[in-house]
C-alpha cells in the first residue's frame, strides 16, 4: 500500500528544485493526474517522454525525481479508480496569510497543469459528454480564482477548501469519461 502514497510536498519541492526542473509538486501532480484522466494507461511508458518534453525541453530527469513522479502516477491511478471517490491533491500546507496566497496559486497551477495533461494524453474533449464539458469549464473558471487581500481571509480560506473539493469532483467526472478503467488496464500476456 505504501507505493500508493503521495510524496511529501516540501521534500518533493526540494527534490524538483535541486534537479533544476521548472515544475513544482502541485503542477507535477496536476499534469500526471490530467494525463491519467485523459486516458493514459499505467502500462504506457510514453508519459515519461511527454513529461520530459513538457517540463525540461525533452531532457530526462534525475532518477530520484523520476521515481517521485512515478510514485505520484501510481498513487493517483489508484485513487482515481477507488470506489471511495477520495482524491488527495498535492498542495502546500501552512498557516497565515502568505500560506493562503501560496495555496491559492498552487490550486490554479494544479488545475492548469491538469488541463494540459488531458491534452497531452490525447483526450478527445470535442466529443465529451455535457457533464464532462461542464466539469472542464468549471476547472477553467476555478483556475482564474484568486485571494482578495481586502476580504476576510478566514472566509476566503473556507471558500478555497470548497473550491478544492469541487476540483476533485470535476477530476473524477473527467476520469470517468476518458480515463482507463481498471479492467481496460490489463497486463500484457507473457508466453
UniProtKB/Swiss-Prot annotation:
This is UPF0149 protein VC_2476. GO terms for cellular component: cytosol. InterPro entries: YgfB-like, YgfB-like_sf. It comes from Vibrio cholerae serotype O1 (strain ATCC 39315 / El Tor Inaba N16961). PANTHER family: UPF0149 PROTEIN YGFB. Belongs to the UPF0149 family. Gene3D superfamilies: YgfB uncharacterised protein family UPF0149, PF03695. Pfam families: UPF0149 (PF03695).
Amino acid at each position: 500500500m505504501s507505493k500508493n502514497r503521495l510524496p511529501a510536498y516540501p521534500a518533493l519541492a526540494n527534490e524538483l528544485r535541486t534537479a533544476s526542473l521548472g515544475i513544482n509538486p502541485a503542477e507535477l501532480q496536476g499534469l500526471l493526474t490530467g494525463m491519467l484522466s485523459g486516458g493514459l494507461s499505467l502500462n504506457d511508458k510514453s508519459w515519461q517522454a511527454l513529461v520530459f518534453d513538457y517540463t525540461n525541453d525533452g531532457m530526462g530527469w534525475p532518477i530520484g525525481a523520476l521515481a517521485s513522479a512515478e510514485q505520484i502516477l501510481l498513487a493517483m491511478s489508484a485513487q482515481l479508480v477507488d470506489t471511495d471517490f477520495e482524491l488527495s491533491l498535492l498542495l502546500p500546507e501552512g498557516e497565515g496569510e502568505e500560506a493562503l496566497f501560496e495555496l491559492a496559486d498552487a490550486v490554479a497551477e494544479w488545475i492548469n497543469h491538469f488541463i494540459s495533461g488531458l491534452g497531452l494524453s490525447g483526450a478527445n474533449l470535442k466529443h465529451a459528454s455535457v457533464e464532462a464539458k461542464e466539469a472542464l469549464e468549471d476547472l477553467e473558471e476555478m483556475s482564474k480564482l484568486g485571494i482578495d487581500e481586502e476580504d476576510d481571509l478566514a472566509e476566503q480560506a473556507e471558500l478555497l477548501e470548497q473550491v478544492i473539493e469541487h476540483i476533485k469532483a470535476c477530476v473524477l467526472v473527467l476520469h470517468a469519461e476518458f480515463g482507463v478503467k481498471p479492467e481496460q488496464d490489463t497486463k500484457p500476456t507473457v508466453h
